Amino acid sequence: GSVARYKQPDSFENVPSSKDLPESDAVMIDSAELIANQANAVTSGLPRYIEAARYWMQYSGIPDSIYNYTNSKNDYVDDYAARGIWVNYLAGGSAANPNEPGLGIPLHASLAFHTDAGIRDEVVGTLIIYKDHDDEKNKKYPTGKSRIVARDLADYMQTQIVEDMRAIYAPEWTRRQLNNSSYAEARHPKVPAVLLELLSHQNPTDMKYGLDPRVRFTISRAMYKSFLKFIH
């Protein structure tokens, strides 16, 4: 089973046990030692890739400085706070984020894909969030571009999703707010980032569409189209 939602030992780090070991072997050994140290942990029974982002990062060999945001004090905060920091780690050392160490991947943008809560008789619909400054109140990305360009991405994505849903499946699909709000997944990334609340997972009318594989394809295509518009 998978270790999930369990307080991590303060001393654990994703570093090789031996300099002679390949990195992949070291990560496997560290992960096995962690599980052995948590013999009484409750396991989720789920594949690692659908557990919390915090645990996916840990068992993928991402440095603990990325995923252990609260120094093992709060898994919930670690989970959402680490996602934008992980984006910065991926882009670190590239033209997109040249001033931080990382994997050198020149990312164009970041998407945090969520469903929302809320119940009503009709469709709850789609909300999207961006943030015009980061934790240090910077209003520009490392590239020099204004962070307000994240609003363009948010507008493209929300518009495309709502228009496609209305045209193909649900003329009543609701376009909710486009918010400049301080959420970690919109605020932390050093590339244009949006947080999408596609629909309400509590609302039967929304989930009638959310469980339809045809709708899922349409939504995925709409997101893809919006990224292309933004990049070009």
What are these regions (language model features)?
Residues S110-K139, I168-H232:
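Active-site-adjacent mobile loop/cap segments within catalytic or ligand-binding domains
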Residues E51-Y55, I85, Y89, R151, ...:
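Solvent-exposed, polar/charged alpha-helical surfaces in well-ordered, non-transmembrane soluble domains
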Residues T43-M57, A112, V124-Q158:
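Metal-dependent peptidase/peptidase-like ectodomains
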